[in-house]
């Protein structure tokens, strides 16, 4: 094989996503998932040349290590050994320490672990994945790509909370933002679509999936984003509440709720699921709405209204606007949700291109609306975070 491939690893608390990415085309030539780690039904599946294979992972512990060990044999069996030139790890939180992709060594791994207080579900798992991969692939250079890194260009006025400064200086409480790798990728692709240098381009990127966030991008740099200290703030999401009066937390604690109950509710029982009382999945919301389900209809209305509010507010962060970018599973595929968001932004002069909007789904990109008033477009750009991780890893070789 003459192609240069990067093995991209996204290690979660009970799962492990992986893909072998062509660093030039961005194509995933192999992709897979390990899931239910720590449970008896732990398993690992992968897709190669259209064929899906699934195996059980035995034992009750060290499933990350076992899964990555199996990756060694799998890549050898499929003939990727000579083609893989690096391993790229998706790491959720880099704090203020990591502003760009870095080559992994023991010091970097310990720094990632030290940031676990900021991302207790994600960073420890990311470090476990790193240690397992370093042991399994000792000869391959490995790199860490951080979800927060793209947002480190935010000005102080955007990332500073209106709280006692000691909370920032002593505890690091500030806006960090997430989905940075996705916002970075789609903004570069959007600049190509409108034939304008990214350094001169201004976008509002709208990543809508089970997790969702908006990012204001000025001259190619993030200048504000809706997620904050944690991924809980900002937009309404699948099970997360988004922006909420913090006084509600005190109120619930006084009502006898435990801290765990409160944060479980806000993280896992809110959003689409909480408002609809039905499901966290946007597709299920739309289906139920068509059948007249009041909760689903309200969830749809709250979600689309809040997205539109954030998009409109981020005009204040930009001198001009070239485009609104829709991406993520919902943003790329849900015609009704995109249409309603644009309808809520009619004051900005956006007129839907019906054929363009209907065509920009299921992996297709395209311009879906235009505003003569702003001289701007709305567009759909499918995200490819794995491609960014592969590219940035190869660039540091």
UniProtKB/Swiss-Prot annotation:
Gene3D superfamilies: 3.30.420.40. Pfam families: Acetate_kinase. Its main location: cytoplasm. ATP binds at residues 17, 207-211, 281-283, 329-333. Pathway: Metabolic intermediate biosynthesis; acetyl-CoA biosynthesis; acetyl-CoA from acetate: step 1/2. Keywords: ATP-binding, Cytoplasm, Kinase, Magnesium, Metal-binding, Nucleotide-binding, Transferase. Mg(2+) binds at residues 10, 385. GO terms for molecular function: acetate kinase activity; ATP binding; magnesium ion binding. InterPro entries: Ac/propionate_kinase (IPR004372), Aliphatic_acid_kin_short-chain (IPR000890), Aliphatic_acid_kinase_CS (IPR023865), ATPase_NBD (IPR043129). Its cofactor is Mg(2+); Mn(2+). One of its GO terms (cellular component) is cytosol. Mg(2+). Can also accept Mn(2+). Substrate binds at residue 90. Belongs to the acetokinase family. This is Acetate kinase 2. It comes from Aliivibrio fischeri (strain ATCC 700601 / ES114) (Vibrio fischeri). The lineage of its organism: Bacteria, Pseudomonadati, Pseudomonadota, Gammaproteobacteria, Vibrionales. The gene is ackA2.
